C-alpha cells in the first residue's frame, strides 16, 4: 500500500512538472529536469596533465604544457583533460572540439596574475565584440563541452583587484576594461554545455561568461569572489549573453557584483547589431546566495530578455533581490519574468532605475522607449531596507506587474503603485 502511495505521489509530481510553463505560457521542456552530472567515462580518453610534463608547482607557469595536452587530445579525437591533486599555474587555455576539463578533488588550476600571460583575441565583453584578453579557460564552438569534478579554478585575482581600485583613485571615470584583466571562464558559440561541481573563485573580472550558447546547465557550482578586505570588482558569478535554454541549479554564489546578470549588447543601435541579441528560457533554481549586488540583474548591457525564472532560492545580505537596469542609451525590453519562493534579505526588494554609467547616445536623436512588462513576484518571505526602490522615467515604461503572497519586513515599506501601469496586488503584507 505504501509503495502504491509512493508511486501515486511520484506520478502526481511528474504530472505537475509536466504542466509547468514559462511566464508567457509556453511549456517548460523536460530537458530542464534532466540534471544528471556528466560521467567522464563516457567522454573519451583521459589525459592527466602530469603524465605529459606538468608538475605540481604553484609558482611555475605551465600554460604551454597544459595547452599541449589539450591539443593532443583534440588531435586524437577528443577526451578529458584531467587536473590532478595539486596546484598548476597557467595563462589562457583554449579547449577544442570534443575536449573536456575535469578537476580532481584537491586540484587547483590557478590563473597567472601577470596579464601578459593571457592572449589578446577577438572576444566579447560588456556588450561589445572586440579584441580583449582571453579568459583563463576558453571554449569556442565546442559543442558538448563540460567542466566537472570537485576541484577549483582559482583566478588569483587579488593583484588585479588592487590595481583596479588604485587606477580608480587616479582616474575616477576609468572603465571596467581599462584595468587589463582576464575573466575566469568564457564559453561561446557552443551548445549542450555542462559545468558541474567545481569551485570557481577569485576571478579578476567576470567569473563565468556564456555567449551565444544554447542548452547550458550549471549544476552544483560554488562561485565566490570577496567583498572584503579587497573588493573583487565586476566579479559577476554568471553572465548570460545572448543565450537560450539555461538552467542554473543548486549553486552557491557570493561575489562583489551581480550573481546572475543577463547581457546582450549596449548602445543606441544595439538591437540592430548582429553580434547582439536576447536571452530566453532561463531558470535559476534551488540556489543559495551570499553577498552580491543582486540576485538577478537585467543589464546593464542588455537588449531583450524573455521567460526568466528565479525560484526556490535563499538570499543572504544581497544589495538587491531583483534589479532591472534601464539604460537610457540602449533600447531594452524585459518581459515575462517570474521570481517566486524566495527567502532571505537584501537592501532592496525590487530596484528599477535609469542606469547611466558610461552613458553615450552616439549622436542618436530618436532614442526609442524601453519597456519592462509581465513581471511577477510571489510567495516570498523577505527582509529588506527598501521594499519598492523604483523611479519614474520618461525613457521607459513599466506595466503588468503582479505582487502575490508576499511577507515583507522593510525599514521603508512605501510603494508608489502609480509608477507601474496595471499593477496587481494580492495577499501582500508589508510590516504586518
Model-inferred region functions:
Residues 2-5, 11, 16-82, 87-189, ...:
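Extracellular "leader-to-stem" segments immediately downstream of a signal peptide or signal-anchor
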Residues 86, 116-128, 248, 269, ...:
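Hydrophobic transmembrane alpha-helix bundles
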Residues 92-95, 112-113, 135-140, 183-189, ...:
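Glycine-rich beta-solenoid repeat tracts in large extracellular/virion proteins
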Residues 19-25, 98, 168-172, 201, ...:
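Short charge-dense sequence patches
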Residues 105-106, 143-152, 191-202, 214-227, ...:
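Right-handed parallel beta-helix
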Residues 53-56, 266-268, 357-359:
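A short, flexible beta-alpha/helix-coil linker loop
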Residues 61-64, 334, 372:
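A generic structural signal for residues located within well-ordered alpha-helices
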Residues 57-64, 73, 82, 97-99, ...:
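Folded extracytoplasmic luminal domains of secretory or organellar precursors
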Amino acid at each position: 500500500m505504501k509503495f502504491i502511495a509512493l508511486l501515486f505521489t511520484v506520478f502526481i509530481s511528474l504530472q505537475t512538472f509536466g504542466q509547468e510553463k514559462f511566464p508567457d505560457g509556453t511549456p517548460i521542456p523536460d530537458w530542464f529536469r534532466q540534471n544528471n552530472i556528466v560521467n567522464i567515462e563516457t567522454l573519451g580518453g583521459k589525459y592527466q596533465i602530469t603524465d605529459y610534463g606538468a608538475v605540481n608547482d604553484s609558482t611555475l607557469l605551465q600554460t604551454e604544457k597544459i595547452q599541449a595536452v589539450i591539443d593532443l587530445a583534440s588531435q586524437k579525437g577528443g577526451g578529458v583533460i584531467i587536473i590532478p591533486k595539486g596546484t598548476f599555474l597557467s595563462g589562457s587555455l583554449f579547449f577544442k572540439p570534443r575536449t573536456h576539463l575535469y578537476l580532481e578533488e584537491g586540484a587547483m588550476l590557478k590563473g597567472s596574475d601577470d596579464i601578459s600571460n593571457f592572449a589578446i583575441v577577438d572576444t566579447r565583453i560588456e556588450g561589445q565584440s572586440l579584441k580583449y584578453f582571453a579568459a583563463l579557460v576558453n571554449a569556442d564552438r565546442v559543442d558538448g563541452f563540460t567542466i566537472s569534478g570537485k576541484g577549483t579554478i582559482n583566478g588569483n585575482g587579488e593583484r588585479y583587484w588592487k590595481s583596479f581600485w588604485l587606477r580608480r583613485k587616479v582616474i575616477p571615470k576609468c572603465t571596467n576594461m581599462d584595468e587589463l584583466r582576464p575573466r575566469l571562464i568564457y564559453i561561446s558559440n557552443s551548445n549542450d554545455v555542462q559545468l558541474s561541481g567545481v569551485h570557481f573563485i577569485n576571478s579578476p573580472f567576470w567569473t563565468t561568461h556564456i555567449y551565444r550558447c544554447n542548452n547550458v546547465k550549471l549544476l552544483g557550482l560554488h562561485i565566490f569572489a570577496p567583498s572584503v578586505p579587497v573588493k573583487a570588482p565586476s566579479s559577476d558569478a554568471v553572465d548570460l549573453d545572448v543565450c537560450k535554454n539555461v538552467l542554473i541549479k543548486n549553486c552557491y554564489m557570493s561575489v562583489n557584483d551581480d550573481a546572475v546578470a543577463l547581457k546582450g549588447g549596449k548602445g543606441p543601435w544595439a538591437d540592430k547589431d548582429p553580434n547582439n541579441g536576447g536571452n530566453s528560457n532561463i531558470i535559476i533554481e534551488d540556489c543559495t546566495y551570499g553577498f552580491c549586488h543582486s540576485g538577478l540583474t537585467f543589464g546593464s548591457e542588455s537588449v531583450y530578455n524573455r521567460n526568466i525564472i528565479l525560484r526556490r532560492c535563499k538570499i543572504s545580505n544581497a544589495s538587491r533581490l531583483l534589479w532591472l537596469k534601464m539604460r537610457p542609451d540602449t533600447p531594452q525590453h524585459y518581459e515575462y519574468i517570474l521570481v517566486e519562493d524566495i527567502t532571505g534579505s537584501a537592501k532592496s526588494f525590487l530596484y528599477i532605475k535609469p542606469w547611466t554609467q558610461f552613458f553615450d547616445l552616439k549622436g542618436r536623436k530618436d532614442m526609442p522607449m524601453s519597456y519592462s512588462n509581465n513581471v511577477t513576484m510571489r510567495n516570498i518571505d523577505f527582509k529588506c531596507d527598501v521594499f519598492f526602490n523604483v523611479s519614474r522615467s520618461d525613457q521607459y515604461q513599466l506595466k503588468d506587474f503582479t505582487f502575490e503572497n508576499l511577507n515583507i519586513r522593510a525599514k521603508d515599506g512605501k510603494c508608489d503603485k502609480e509608477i507601474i501601469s496595471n499593477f496587481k496586488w494580492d495577499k501582500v503584507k508589508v510590516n504586518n
